[in-house]
Each structure stands twice: as structure tokens, then as C-alpha cells.
UniProtKB/Swiss-Prot annotation:
Gene from which this protein is expressed: rpsT
Pfam families named among the record's database cross-references: Ribosomal_S20p (PF01649)
Entry keywords, A to Z: Ribonucleoprotein, Ribosomal protein, RNA-binding, rRNA-binding
Source organism of this protein record: Kineococcus radiotolerans (strain ATCC BAA-149 / DSM 14245 / SRS30216)
Protein name: Small ribosomal subunit protein bS20
Keyword rRNA-binding belongs to the record: yes
Coiled-coil ranges (or none): none
Family: Belongs to the bacterial ribosomal protein bS20 family.
Length: 86
């Protein structure tokens, strides 16, 4: 355990950030999974709605600093490409 006061504060801050990041990443996985399930079911309308939601959540994660903008762009591109095949 740290002895320096500022390091004790950083430990608490880092833990809060870790939990927040974990929650956001979990939500991202959930919405992308929902998109893939809609795609697998062949429901184009539901897939488009899920695509829009996933894109929104990915952009939100970038703005919060959870993921890098290029990673979000790659993921959005991949799911958009999959949606275009239907």
C-alpha cells in the first residue's frame, strides 16, 4: 500500500475509473452482441436499429476515453460492413 497521500488518492481514482471502464466495455459488448443476434436472425430492421445504437455507444465510449477513436472506427466499420451484406 502506498504511503504518499497523493498516491492513495490515485489508487482510489484508478479503481473508480477501472470499474467505470469495465461497465462501459461490458455495455459495448452487449450492444454489439445484440446487433449480431439480430443479423443472425435475419431481421434487417432490428439489425439497423441495433447498428445505430452500437455506433452511438462506441462514440460515447470514445468521448469518455474508454477506447481509442481508431478502435471505435474499426468496430463501427466491421459491423456496418456486416449489416450491408443483409
Amino acid at each position: 500500500m502506498a504511503n504518499i497521500k497523493s498516491q492513495k488518492k490515485r489508487i482510489l481514482t484508478n479503481e473508480k475509473a477501472r470499474l467505470r471502464n469495465k461497465a462501459v466495455k461490458s455495455e459495448l459488448r452487449t450492444v454489439v452482441r445484440g446487433f449480431r443476434e439480430a443479423l443472425a436472425a435475419g431481421d434487417a430492421e432490428k439489425a439497423q436499429a441495433a447498428l445505430a445504437l452500437a455506433s452511438k455507444k462506441l462514440d460515447k465510449a470514445v468521448s469518455k476515453g474508454v477506447i481509442h477513436k481508431n478502435q471505435a472506427a474499426n468496430r463501427k466499420s466491421a459491423i456496418a460492413k456486416a449489416a450491408a451484406k443483409v
